[in-house]
């Protein structure tokens, strides 16, 4: 497993109030490479907090790639939250099977909405009050497989269903065969639930293996 220092979190952030803001284009960085290792789509940014603006010139140069070499937005380093560790662990399992190596590169995090709050209901209320950035076109066009869809039931509610389905169809087009082609037959387990609370359950193991083996009918052989 990794220590805190082995995972860096970089993101854009716009402060609204002392406790509220928009967080988007979040990257989990491991090792020395900046190659994209995959993408995850979730509900909304959680409890991870701003640490400081990124000042390292080499890091900033690497991050500009993720902005299409545009530098208008400030990059910040954030402290990780429990969900980020679960994303790390899920992709670590994936890459240990496919490459037999530790993570070395970037995992992209996308969301259905971008208000930062660990409590989804509060985040939804804030969206209603403050509005939110619509980054769906940008996000969908920047998905890189493997793509884990972990937005749970929020993706099936009326407000966010269209956005979730755009990510879903983009993932299918990118060759992700771990999802049922019928959108509504998928569970889309959130990584925190999958890797912590459901980790030792039969359905949790099946969901992990579906993603790792990229099939709806995984095997447990070997």
Describe each region flagged by the PLM.
Residues 1-75, 220-222:
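Active-site and ligand/interface coordination hotspots across diverse enzymes
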Residues 37, 105, 144-148:
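Conserved acidic residues
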Residues 42, 111, 190-193:
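Residue-level detector of functionally special positions within alpha-helical transmembrane segments
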Residues 44, 113, 154:
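Catalytic metal-binding/acid-base residues of hydrolase active sites
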Residues 50, 67-80, 116-127, 154-155:
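Surface-exposed cleft-lining segments at the edges of enzyme active sites
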Residues 82-101:
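A short, N-terminal amphipathic alpha-helix
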Residues 101-121:
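Short connector loops at secondary-structure junctions
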Residues 116-222:
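Glycine/proline-rich loop-helix segments at beta-alpha junctions forming the active-site rim
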């Amino acid at each position: 497993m990794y220590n805190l220092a082995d995972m860096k979190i970089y993101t854009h952030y716009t402060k609204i109030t002392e406790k509220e803001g928009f967080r988007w284009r979040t990257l989990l960085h491991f090792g020395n490479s900046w190659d994209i290792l995959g993408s995850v789509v979730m509900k909304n940014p959680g409890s991870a907090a701003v640490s400081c603006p990124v000042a390292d010139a080499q890091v900033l140069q690497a991050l500009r790639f993720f902005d299409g070499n545009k530098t208008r937005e400030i990059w910040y380093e954030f402290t990780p939250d429990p969900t980020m560790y679960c994303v790390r662990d899920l992709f670590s399992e994936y890459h240990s099977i496919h490459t037999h190596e530790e993570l070395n590169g970037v995992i992209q995090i996308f969301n259905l909405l971008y208000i930062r709050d660990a409590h989804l209901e509060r985040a939804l209320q804030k969206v209603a009050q403050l509005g939110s950035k619509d980054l769906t076109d940008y996000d969908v066009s920047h998905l890189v497989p493997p793509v884990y869809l972990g937005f749970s039931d929020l993706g099936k509610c009326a407000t966010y269903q269209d956005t979730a389905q755009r990510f879903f169809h983009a993932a299918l087009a990118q060759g992700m065969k771990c999802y049922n082609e019928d959108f509504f037959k998928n569970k889309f387990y959130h990584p925190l639930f999958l890797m912590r609370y459901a980790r030792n359950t039969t359905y949790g193991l099946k969901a992990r293996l579906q993603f790792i083996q990229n099939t709806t009918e995984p095997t447990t052989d070997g």
